[in-house]
């Protein structure tokens, strides 16, 4: 998705992009190393299956949130995010492809600055929602 300017967001419009394609175990392990979260359900197949009862290792929730953040920064640009929250609804597995979706709401004034709230959803290749969330971002105004 080409970078947009926040003032080009249209209230009520929905935006979507693939943010992770065919997530690999290596990407999960790399995220564990960078984040410092080396919990065994994310990096140890034996632990995940025998102790945790999962079919395999799975991605960190924050990896999913970070991927969703890619859509947000594509829409509003860097340095404009005021709040960002996400709820993780189901595991993200190796091999998953994730699409982030955002819906723009009407702009508001917050402490003298114009902000827009985006409602977020992340779905896998099966159409299952794996996360939901929101972000607010500074904007100069909305068209439409």
Q: Language-model features: where?
A:
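Catalytic strand-loop segment that frames the active site of acyl-thioester-processing enzymes
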Residues: 1-57
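Hydrophobic beta-strand-centered segment that forms part of the acyl-chain substrate-binding groove
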Residues: 49-105
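HotDog/MaoC-like acyl-thioester-processing domains
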Residues: 1-15, 93-144
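Short, intrinsically disordered, mixed-charge
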Residues: 33-36, 73-78, 125
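Residue-level structural signal for beta-strand termini and adjacent loop
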Residues: 20, 69, 135-136
């Amino acid at each position: 998705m080409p970078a947009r300017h926040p003032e080009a967001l249209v209230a009520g419009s929905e935006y979507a992009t693939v943010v992770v394609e065919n997530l690999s175990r290596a990407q999960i392990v790399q995220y564990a190393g960078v984040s410092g979260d080396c919990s065994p359900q994310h990096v140890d197949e034996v632990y995940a299956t025998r102790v945790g009862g999962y079919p395999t290792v799975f991605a960190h929730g924050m990896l999913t949130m970070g991927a969703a953040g890619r859509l947000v920064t594509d829409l509003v640009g860097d340095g404009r995010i005021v709040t960002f929250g996400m709820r993780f609804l189901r595991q993200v597995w190796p091999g998953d492809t994730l699409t982030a979706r955002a819906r723009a709401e009407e702009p508001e004034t917050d402490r003298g600055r114009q902000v827009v709230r985006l409602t977020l959803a992340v779905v896998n290749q099966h159409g299952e929602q794996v996360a939901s969330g929101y972000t607010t971002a500074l904007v100069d105004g909305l068209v439409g």
